[in-house]
């Protein structure tokens, strides 16, 4: 039917007959000549329908946007002054000799070049939305990324092995999606949150290097830019230490960016430990494009009269930090007030600040309502510690460390990305990757009054930290590592526990009894007793990588058929009700069901 793609038709085909298939992107009647912009996945080509060919011209008069056509014609130069440098085919046009309507179209609910469509409209009519060039480009880049990943891993000796989609429910942080078993009444499968345990078992089984590009499922609370199903580049390898694993996969990401975007990422990636990341940026995935850092002022604030500062400085797990904004003294009060409202989202009760007008004058050179409640020695130490200069602004965070880190960490990014930040050189618009390492092995859950695994309970402790799991879990560090790029976690992993007795120690630290551990993880504990090799791995979020590479506004723009923030598919209206007969077969009865809000 077709000899050439529309978007690839060029001067190389001048005076040749081509057959094209595609959709009417736009039809223009110029009083005697009809122009059709015909579109396929490769782009557009201009087709000319001349009244001298009566049958072609008559058919062209009837076509409308999104009609599916087959056109045969001669490639010729466009008339002088009508070329389009934005198109590969912009120097030529096709004079139609034949025009066949393969399928007409009803009037589309929107124009494909409308950039102001709501996401609801786009997702409801996803098939049409996917015809848009931007969506075509996004998904083709996604394909290219997966191909580059496969080529790299294949060359490194990794084997693509599928793991089960119907598996056992085990705690990994989020809620599982459960699948009732009809033939095993009262029992449920779970859809995997990750192939974590299976890939470890594959290492015990001597497959040495495994990978899989697979779907994972998490029944999480509603959050922006999260999907209940997502795609993971999942990898595991035996007989490699933490540094070797990081080096290997850093090379993979560097190659993907080079071959897909022609971007040279730094070699090697910088490495930062978790404590430094939290101390300087309030985040374990800091955006290194932003040139702002925390200054810890906790010790300085312990004896000041300003109770907001001294109270936080003296409380357990309290923290006081300063965020110096060079040139921020020029920031209008309205912008400062807006930032005050912004940090409230993260639990901050306010946003104190000091403008440094003339630091040589001491207290008299500082402008802020809080200055009167801070003694001269503390003020001098604040200026010295932050390195503030005339014309600078210092924001302060004072509260529990988590609130300060969340609020001032978000403020740091907000200021850096603002027009003010970009105009004042506080933001570098480039790719800034980073490894974050030495994560805490455990974190304390105040609600349940027990320790939980920071990553997952199969992460190995750092050398020399094994005994801390029982004596001081809060000081125990792990062999975990995250790859961060421009404030996003691209992937994370760890060296795994390969000895059953160490795995049992972790379960004890997490208050998982031997009986519960055997019930939930007995298959893993048993496997570890058969000479399990040292092993570790990493998993990358494919959706997130492609979102960053395309510059898409939402992760939903790089997934063909995504769910909404309410975990619904507006195209198919999933999830849906099922009939009573199906429920009875599954031994399920619904109770107190609330109406589902669609959209």
Swiss-Prot record:
<dbReference type="Pfam" id="PF01336">
    <property type="entry name" value="tRNA_anti-codon"/>
</dbReference>
<dbReference type="GO" id="GO:0050560">
    <property type="term" value="F:aspartate-tRNA(Asn) ligase activity"/>
</dbReference>
<dbReference type="InterPro" id="IPR012340">
    <property type="entry name" value="NA-bd_OB-fold"/>
</dbReference>
<feature type="binding site">
    <location>
        <position position="489"/>
    </location>
    <ligand>
        <name>ATP</name>
    </ligand>
</feature>
<feature type="site" description="Important for tRNA non-discrimination">
    <location>
        <position position="30"/>
    </location>
</feature>
<keyword id="KW-0547">Nucleotide-binding</keyword>
<feature type="site" description="Important for tRNA non-discrimination">
    <location>
        <position position="81"/>
    </location>
</feature>
<comment type="similarity">
    <text>Belongs to the class-II aminoacyl-tRNA synthetase family. Type 1 subfamily.</text>
</comment>
<keyword id="KW-0648">Protein biosynthesis</keyword>
<dbReference type="Pfam" id="PF02938">
    <property type="entry name" value="GAD"/>
</dbReference>
<dbReference type="InterPro" id="IPR029351">
    <property type="entry name" value="GAD_dom"/>
</dbReference>
<comment type="function">
    <text>Aspartyl-tRNA synthetase with relaxed tRNA specificity since it is able to aspartylate not only its cognate tRNA(Asp) but also tRNA(Asn). Reaction proceeds in two steps: L-aspartate is first activated by ATP to form Asp-AMP and then transferred to the acceptor end of tRNA(Asp/Asn).</text>
</comment>
<keyword id="KW-0963">Cytoplasm</keyword>
<protein>
    <recommendedName>
        <fullName>Aspartate--tRNA(Asp/Asn) ligase</fullName>
        <ecNumber>6.1.1.23</ecNumber>
    </recommendedName>
</protein>
<feature type="binding site">
    <location>
        <begin position="218"/>
        <end position="220"/>
    </location>
    <ligand>
        <name>ATP</name>
    </ligand>
</feature>
<feature type="region of interest" description="Aspartate">
    <location>
        <begin position="196"/>
        <end position="199"/>
    </location>
</feature>
<dbReference type="InterPro" id="IPR004524">
    <property type="entry name" value="Asp-tRNA-ligase_1"/>
</dbReference>
<feature type="binding site">
    <location>
        <position position="172"/>
    </location>
    <ligand>
        <name>L-aspartate</name>
    </ligand>
</feature>
<feature type="binding site">
    <location>
        <begin position="541"/>
        <end position="544"/>
    </location>
    <ligand>
        <name>ATP</name>
    </ligand>
</feature>
<comment type="subunit">
    <text>Homodimer.</text>
</comment>
<dbReference type="InterPro" id="IPR047090">
    <property type="entry name" value="AspRS_core"/>
</dbReference>
<feature type="binding site">
    <location>
        <position position="227"/>
    </location>
    <ligand>
        <name>ATP</name>
    </ligand>
</feature>
<feature type="binding site">
    <location>
        <position position="455"/>
    </location>
    <ligand>
        <name>L-aspartate</name>
    </ligand>
</feature>
<feature type="binding site">
    <location>
        <position position="496"/>
    </location>
    <ligand>
        <name>L-aspartate</name>
    </ligand>
</feature>
<dbReference type="GO" id="GO:0006422">
    <property type="term" value="P:aspartyl-tRNA aminoacylation"/>
</dbReference>
<dbReference type="InterPro" id="IPR004115">
    <property type="entry name" value="GAD-like_sf"/>
</dbReference>
<dbReference type="InterPro" id="IPR004365">
    <property type="entry name" value="NA-bd_OB_tRNA"/>
</dbReference>
<dbReference type="InterPro" id="IPR045864">
    <property type="entry name" value="aa-tRNA-synth_II/BPL/LPL"/>
</dbReference>
<dbReference type="InterPro" id="IPR002312">
    <property type="entry name" value="Asp/Asn-tRNA-synth_IIb"/>
</dbReference>
<dbReference type="GO" id="GO:0003676">
    <property type="term" value="F:nucleic acid binding"/>
</dbReference>
<dbReference type="InterPro" id="IPR004364">
    <property type="entry name" value="Aa-tRNA-synt_II"/>
</dbReference>
<dbReference type="GO" id="GO:0005737">
    <property type="term" value="C:cytoplasm"/>
</dbReference>
<dbReference type="Pfam" id="PF00152">
    <property type="entry name" value="tRNA-synt_2"/>
</dbReference>
<dbReference type="InterPro" id="IPR006195">
    <property type="entry name" value="aa-tRNA-synth_II"/>
</dbReference>
<dbReference type="GO" id="GO:0005524">
    <property type="term" value="F:ATP binding"/>
</dbReference>
<dbReference type="InterPro" id="IPR047089">
    <property type="entry name" value="Asp-tRNA-ligase_1_N"/>
</dbReference>
<feature type="binding site">
    <location>
        <position position="218"/>
    </location>
    <ligand>
        <name>L-aspartate</name>
    </ligand>
</feature>
<keyword id="KW-0067">ATP-binding</keyword>
<keyword id="KW-0436">Ligase</keyword>
<keyword id="KW-0030">Aminoacyl-tRNA synthetase</keyword>
<dbReference type="GO" id="GO:0004815">
    <property type="term" value="F:aspartate-tRNA ligase activity"/>
</dbReference>
């Amino acid at each position: 039917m077709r000899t050439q793609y529309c978007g690839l038709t060029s001067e190389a085909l001048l005076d040749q007959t081509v057959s094209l298939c595609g959709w009417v992107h736009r039809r223009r009647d110029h009083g005697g000549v009809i122009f059709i912009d015909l579109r396929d996945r490769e782009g557009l080509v201009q087709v000319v329908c001349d009244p001298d060919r009566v049958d072609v011209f008559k058919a062209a008069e009837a076509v409308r946007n999104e009609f599916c056509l087959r056109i045969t014609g001669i490639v010729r130069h466009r008339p002088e002054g009508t070329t389009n440098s934005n198109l590969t085919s912009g120097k030529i046009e096709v004079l139609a000799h034949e025009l066949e309507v393969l399928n007409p179209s009803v009037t589309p609910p929107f124009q494909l070049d409308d950039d102001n469509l709501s996401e609801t409209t786009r997702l409801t009519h996803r098939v049409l939305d996917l015809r848009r060039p931007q969506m075509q480009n996004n998904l083709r880049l996604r394909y290219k990324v997966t191909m580059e990943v496969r080529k790299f891993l294949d060359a490194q000796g990794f084997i693509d092995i599928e793991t089960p989609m119907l598996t056992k429910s085990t705690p990994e942080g989020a809620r599982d999606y459960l699948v009732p078993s009809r033939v095993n009444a009262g029992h449920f499968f779970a859809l995997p949150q990750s192939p974590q345990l299976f890939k470890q078992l594959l290492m015990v089984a001597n497959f040495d290097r495994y990978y899989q590009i697979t779907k994972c499922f998490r029944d999480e609370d509603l959050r922006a830019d999260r999907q209940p199903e997502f795609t993971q580049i999942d990898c595991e390898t035996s007989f490699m230490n933490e540094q070797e694993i990081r080096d290997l996969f850093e090379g993979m990401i560097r190659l993907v960016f080079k071959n897909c975007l022609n971007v040279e990422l730094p070699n090697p990636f910088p490495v930062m430990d978790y404590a430094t990341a939290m101390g300087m940026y309030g985040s374990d995935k800091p955006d290194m494009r932003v040139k702002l850092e925390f200054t810890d002022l906790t010790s300085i604030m312990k004896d000041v009269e300003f109770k907001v500062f001294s109270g936080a400085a003296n409380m357990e797990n309290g923290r006081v930090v300063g965020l110096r904004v060079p040139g921020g003294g020029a920031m209008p009060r309205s912008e400062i007030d807006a930032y005050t409202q912004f940090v409230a989202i993260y639990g901050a009760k306010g946003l104190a600040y000091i403008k440094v007008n003339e630091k040589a004058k001491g207290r008299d050179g500082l402008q802020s309502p809080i200055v009167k409640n801070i003694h001269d020695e503390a003020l001098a130490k604040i200026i010295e510690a932050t390195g503030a200069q005339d014309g600078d602004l210092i924001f302060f965070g004072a509260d529990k460390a988590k609130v300060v880190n969340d609020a001032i960490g978000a403020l740091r990014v907000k200021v850096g990305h603002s027009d003010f930040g970009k105009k004042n050189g506080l933001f570098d618009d480039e790719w800034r990757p980073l490894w974050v390492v030495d994560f805490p092995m455990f974190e304390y859950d105040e609600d349940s009054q027990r320790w939980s695994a920071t990553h997952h309970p199969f992460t190995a402790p750092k050398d020399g930290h094994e005994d801390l799991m029982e004596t001081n879990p809060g000081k125990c560090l792990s062999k975990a590592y995250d790859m961060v790029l421009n404030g996003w976690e691209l992937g994370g992993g760890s060296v795994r526990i390969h000895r059953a007795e160490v795995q049992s120690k972790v379960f004890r630290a997490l208050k998982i009894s031997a009986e519960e551990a055997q019930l939930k993880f007995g298959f893993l504990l048993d496997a570890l007793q058969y000479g399990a090799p040292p092993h570790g791995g990493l998993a990358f979020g494919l959706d997130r990588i492609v979102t960053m590479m395309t510059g898409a506004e939402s992760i939903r723009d790089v997934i063909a058929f995504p769910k909404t923030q309410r975990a619904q598919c507006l195209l198919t209206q999933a999830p849906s009700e099922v009939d009573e007969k199906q429920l009875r077969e599954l031994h399920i009865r619904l109770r107190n069901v609330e109406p589902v809000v669609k959209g």
